[in-house]
Design a protein with these regions (language model features):
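N-terminal secretory signal peptides and thylakoid transit peptides that target proteins
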Residues: 1-21, 25
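C-terminal motif of bacterial Sec signal peptides marking the signal peptidase cleavage site
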Residues: 28-29
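Short, conserved catalytic or interaction motifs in soluble domains
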Residues: 32
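Low-complexity, acidic Ser/Thr/Pro/Gly-rich terminal tails and inter-domain linkers that flank the onset
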Residues: 36-61
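Surface-exposed edge beta-strand/loop patches
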Residues: 39-41, 119-174
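A structural detector for beta-sheet-dominated domains
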Residues: 47, 54-56, 72, 80-82, ...
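The feature marks short-to-medium sequence segments in extracytoplasmic or secretory-pathway proteins
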Residues: 59-62, 72-122, 149-153, 159
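Structural beta-strand segments of beta-rich domains
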Residues: 65-67
Length: 174
């Protein structure tokens, strides 16, 4: 006995297959390899092969947030204060951003490119008056702001984010 697969059956089963595939991706969850997240001590690899960045430690002493990084470049990269951002979220969901020239310093703060396969250990310091009221504190590292020699080709969708809230709340001095 044979079965003739009609056009109607084909369309019906094709639609069911499409729904099943779409549904399975919602159930498994998705992570974006271009935007990894972690906490203090985590090594993140934003951009799938651009670099490996580790936030070694984060402390706060009433007015200054200090973060120590270990960044291993896999391609030629700039590493300066424009590549870092600190996001502070308060109880009423107000977000305050510190980036570039807004109270951020980086040592070393080189405008030159670091060659591929170079290890750099920058220290980020940010002048922030009061973190005691913060509900969430995140440090963001953007390895490439734009394509080499092309300021119009932005890479700002590739970054790593560390949630440092627990580490900082443990170092706040009263």
């Amino acid at each position: 006995m044979s079965y003739t697969f009609s056009r109607r059956d084909f369309m019906k089963y094709t639609a069911l297959t499409a729904v099943a595939i779409a549904g399975s991706s919602m159930l498994t969850g998705c992570s974006n390899p271009n935007r990894p997240t972690g906490t203090v001590g985590s090594t993140l690899k934003p951009g799938d092969g651009i670099c490996e960045a580790t936030l070694k430690g984060a402390t706060y002493n009433r007015t200054t947030l200090t973060c120590n990084f270990d960044i291993y470049t896999k391609v030629s990269l700039q590493i300066n204060k424009n590549h870092f951002q600190v996001n502070v979220t308060t109880g009423d969901q107000t977000k305050i951003y510190y980036y570039g020239n807004s109270n951020i310093e980086l040592n070393p703060n080189s405008l030159k490119d670091y060659e591929a396969k170079t290890s750099v250990k920058p220290t980020l310091t940010v002048d922030i008056a009061d973190l005691a009221a913060a509900d969430k504190i995140e440090v963001v590292y953007i390895p490439k702001l734009w394509a080499k020699d092309s300021l119009t080709d932005s890479y700002s969708d590739i970054y790593g984010t560390w949630d440092i809230t627990k580490a900082i709340k443990g170092t706040i001095l009263s």
